[in-house]
Amino acid sequence: MKVISLKKDSFNKGGAVITLLPEDKEDLFTVYQIVDKDDELIFKKKFTSKLDEAGKKKSTDLVKLKIKVISEDFDMKDEYLKYKGVTVTDESGASNVDIPVGKYLSFTLDYVYPFTIIKQNFNKFMQKLLNEACNIEYKSDTAAVVLQEGIAHVCLVTSSSTILKQKIEYSMPKKKRTTDVLKFDEKTEKFYKAIYSAMKKDLNFDKLKTIILCSPGFYAKILMDKIFQYAEEEHNKKILDNKGMFFIAHCSTGYLQGINEVLKNPLYASKLQDTKYSKEIMVMDEFLLHLNKDDDKAWYGEKEVVKAAEYGAISYLLLTDKVLHSDNIAQREEYLKLMDSVESNGGKALVLSTLHSLGEELDQLTGIACILKYPLPDLDEDDGEE
């Protein structure tokens, strides 16, 4: 992400004017978390106009527009973020020239033209999101291939989601006769070669630190041997010079949940300790463990968590990005104060993306939860109850 300028709004306390140029899908997700309904956007859009009555001659102009946001449409996998809004008055006179106020327009973000966000409410969480988006070390540095016989999934693991880049599926023949064995071996070779080709196409080996190959049985080990074999045959230096980034892990399935199994497995913690998402999985796993044990060290729900924070008892505060993107600005500010309170008492605050299975799970538990430093029973009872 390129932050071209960020100015606090002198007329609107708590507001800001930010000019950005997103560079990848992670940046789109950052913008999605920052822009709220009723914020204003200034952007450039191409308009095609007819010059004659026959409509044969046309001109395409790049027009500067300003809209107030009504709604958004976001798809992480397809790198798609679109805002719908209505044109508003631009006091500077630079935008909406020859475009009437009140006209409904849409704006799809791209990686070519910078755009400006005029926010009514810009808080420290949004500032943190921008800082992280500009930090290349914080970007996705982990890929994973999870497989079993005849099926494989090539994925990127980011702080905001597990992105399926390509699914490879082959129908494997049954080995009843000698000819079937030969067919099986041929199909197996094609299967592994297809995975290798998908990895070359969809993964940027220059930016990755870790590539997880995981499977039940020995499929992951065979895949790694095949990857290095094919790389030797092609003299693929990007792979041959980075053999150390590959590691093999065991999981129970060749589907996406197999990646989650690996990320939360303590056996692989040392190899994954530098990845942000691995930390989130381990904390969420600990929360669910305490919840299942019913040992009064894990609570969810706003009332219970706020009460635990008042005691200074929170070790980890867990929030979804959805609650921090709430239309209720006052409630959003209360959650930010809660994060400050927890951190000032030595705890840590984690924000989980609802595009990940972790965030989805927390969202089903009210979107706010905590792990305590010590057990606190009866947090769910009213203060006046005996």
UniProtKB/Swiss-Prot annotation:
Single GO biological process annotation from the record: RNA surveillance
Cofactor or coenzyme needed: a divalent metal cation
Entry-linked Pfam families: eRF1_1, eRF1_2, eRF1_3
Record-annotated membrane-spanning stretches: none
Annotated GO CC locations: cytoplasm; Dom34-Hbs1 complex
Compartments, record wording: Cytoplasm
Effect seen on changing E361R: Reduced ability to trigger the No-Go Decay (NGD) pathway, reduced ability to promote degradation of non-functional rRNAs
A GO MF term: metal ion binding
Positions in coiled-coil regions: none
UniProt subunit comment: Monomer. Component of the Dom34-Hbs1 complex, also named Pelota-HBS1L complex, composed of DOM34 and HBS1.
Entry similarity comment: Belongs to the eukaryotic release factor 1 family. Pelota subfamily.
Note: Present with 1720 molecules/cell in log phase SD medium.
Protein name stated in the entry: Protein DOM34
Organism: Saccharomyces cerevisiae (strain ATCC 204508 / S288c) (Baker's yeast)
Lineage: Eukaryota, Fungi, Dikarya, Ascomycota, Saccharomycotina
Gene label: DOM34
